Amino acid sequence: MSDLGAVISLLLWGRQLFALYSGNDVTDISDDRFPKPPEIANGYVEHLFRYQCKNYYRLRTEGDGVYTLNDKKQWINKAVGDKLPECEAVCGKPKNPANPVQRILGGHLDAKGSFPWQAKMVSHHNLTTGATLINEQWLLTTAKNLFLNHSENATAKDIAPTLTLYVGKKQLVEIEKVVLHPNYHQVDIGLIKLKQKVLVNERVMPICLPSKNYAEVGRVGYVSGWGQSDNFKLTDHLKYVMLPVADQYDCITHYEGSTCPKWKAPKSPVGVQPILNEHTFCVGMSKYQEDTCYGDAGSAFAVHDLEEDTWYAAGILSFDKSCAVAEYGVYVKVTSIQHWVQKTIAEN
């Protein structure tokens, strides 16, 4: 409950008011700073308090967060009794969101913390990739990222100690475990659990998981990362680019020659075939020929829902080898893996 604060609300209907709660402190209000409320005819003073959360957290409760002292000296909420609320992290609400006039291959620098869900993962051979914070203790990345410099026989227990992970402004966080998707050869996804919850703030914030499909053809999303830039060197600065969702038929034809299994043949212009199936969608290049590149995998295709003013992870970048040479990057649909994600988090 460390993120839970409480303040007193006063109603001139109750008994004698004796204390003011603020944060984790209880202050006696019998002195001059907090004078006793004046009495009113045919009425009384009732004392109660209301829980509130710190910045970047919100109250989760079936009640209203207001607790009243009953005759047994118990603090009770009308809806939930003595059950306390929780403060959960806000997701998808960056303080300084990216906007369309700002424009990682040739992308613009993220100087304002527009992508607080973006994490940086480094393998034991110093290869940099991306990961995406989805709550205070869990991140999504690709299975390929987790297996970098490991044999196919490596287990999740073998992999976890070899990874270094940073969130926010180079904040090192410790990894407790990694969990690979049971069908990771076809669904290129894995989860990372941290040993401790991160403190959510302006620089560190999860992105929301979608309740609907945002991977519609033509929809524009933002992708951030530390991948190779236009000089094919890894960047020390987080960059981002705006990219449109592409037609799946065109994407499959580009990489496999045909959507018909009978006529499919490898024809990737970069010599590596992406995983293309019902769990993926494709994204094209920007009008400036900007694209993702090596090292950006694991980053989110972040979509801004204007009606809700909330950012959602529509996809996780799996194939980051297009580098403005191939026409399409390939992403794992978050809606396709969401049940597995929620189940895995609940069980771990």
Swiss-Prot record:
GO terms for molecular function: hemoglobin binding; serine-type endopeptidase activity. Disulfide bonds join 251-282, 293-323. The uncleaved signal sequence interacts with HDL fluid lipids and mediates incorporation into the HDL particle. One of its GO terms (cellular component) is blood microparticle. It is found in: Secreted. This is Haptoglobin-related protein. Residues 1-18 form the signal peptide. Primate-specific plasma protein associated with apolipoprotein L-I (apoL-I)-containing high-density lipoprotein (HDL). This HDL particle, termed trypanosome lytic factor-1 (TLF-1), mediates human innate immune protection against many species of African trypanosomes. Binds hemoglobin with high affinity and may contribute to the clearance of cell-free hemoglobin to allow hepatic recycling of heme iron. It comes from Homo sapiens. In adult liver the amount of HPR mRNA is at the lower limit of detection, therefore the extent of its expression is at most less than 1000-fold that of the HP1F gene. No HPR mRNA can be detected in fetal liver. Expressed in Hep-G2 and leukemia MOLT-4 cell lines.
